[in-house]
Amino acid sequence: MSLKKELSGRRSVQAKVEAPGSTQSAVERRSAEAELRTLIAKFAPAHLGLIVAMRRWLRKRLPTACEVVYEYRDWFVISYSPNEHGYEGVLGIRASADGVKLFFNRCKELPDPAKLLQGSGNQCRSINLEGASTLARLEVARLTRCAADGCCRRRASGRGPLVPRPGP
């Protein structure tokens, strides 16, 4: 984070802080989208339509979130985070040849009366998505809203960047 200091008199110092990643140029965005398309083609080509629908659906709910993209083993992840650190994301897409999952970080804090969340992890759990129709379920929307509350509110407006991370 760059920090610019302006002296306004002898006794006081006023600091202006610029948020990192607040804008992404069109060239950077196109490059990041190309990297994402490469990962989709490598790991989950059969699920392209579902991944596109999920990104659109999540982007509506978290318009200023950073989409942090990285590969891990035989899948890739798109983490929706308040900053450029994927591990701080509250929601995520995990895609592989086996299928697509909607991941919830900090799942212990989420109310899940319909018992949709699968897995036994203390940190992350997921919902298997058979199709875009799963996203239309009221229970999924409620879980997503609860997970998104308080996240990604740091930037008042604008579109969050797509941030590809190098693979292993």
List each language-model region with its residue ranges.
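Charge-dense, helix-prone N-terminal extensions
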Residues: 1-168
